[in-house]
Amino acid sequence: MIEIKGLYKSFDDKTVLSDINADFANGKTNLIIGQSGSGKTVLMKCIVGLLTPEKGEVLYDGRNLVLMGKKEKKMLRKEMGMIFQSAALFDSMTVFDNVMFPLNMFSNDILRDRIKRAMFCLDRVNLGEAKDKFPGEISGGMQKRVAIARAIALNPQYLFCDEPNSGLDPKTSLVIDDLIHDITQEYNMTTIINTHDMNSVLGIGEKVIYIYEGHKEWEGTKDDIFTSTNERLNNFCLLYTSDAADD
């Protein structure tokens, strides 16, 4: 579980996050939503340790990231998997070598076991047969699946996804959503997804937090959205559902 307590973050005397409190459970897909400039990306960066809040706690199963030294943070990052808005694959490496990269960097396993793990992860995302291809030779959706395989290579406890469906068509987005959801349950990971894709929210949003102008405006489940009386949330959902329909 990841817990956020009384989180504040400012830039140049402008408060970007104000008194954010939230908890994200294991084995569930937790979604952070909000318009551009709402603070959701800053919140994600504070959670993973890329930014340091002025005040508050970020607890990883009771361990406060804010108070950790460099060595502790390095150890914690080995427990994290990350999927970026762009797949962020190495173009000069094959699909297989991309998945092997974190294993070669951080795993103490012998080479045979690292290879076995990489192939297991590729097979899990149905890309075993594409292992010798380069990123430029496969589709955008396949690249995202490679990114998922790489993210789970070290068997992380925590998975962070930044706009994982960006640039994908609705059908491919559904495949990626289902894959992230299923893997989250299989590994009992704490998964946090930063998105404004309402199809994702309504499809896999087991917990949803809506950020508005740096404040936590609303939280609930995907089903709670349909009965929400929060006008700001309702306007956001209407806007981005309409955008998805137009696409």
Describe each PLM feature range.
Residues 48:
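Helix-to-loop junction immediately C-terminal to a conserved catalytic motif
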Residues 56-64:
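Conserved ABC transporter NBD signature motif
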Residues 170-172:
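Helix N-cap at the start of a conserved alpha-helix in ABC-type nucleotide-binding domains
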Residues 159-162:
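Catalytic Walker B motif of ABC-type/P-loop ATPase nucleotide-binding domains
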Residues 240-245:
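Conserved small/polar residues in nucleotide/adenosyl-binding loops
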Residues 134-138, 142:
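Conserved ABC ATPase signature
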Residues 153-157:
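A short, proline-enriched helix->beta-strand linker immediately N-terminal to the Walker B motif
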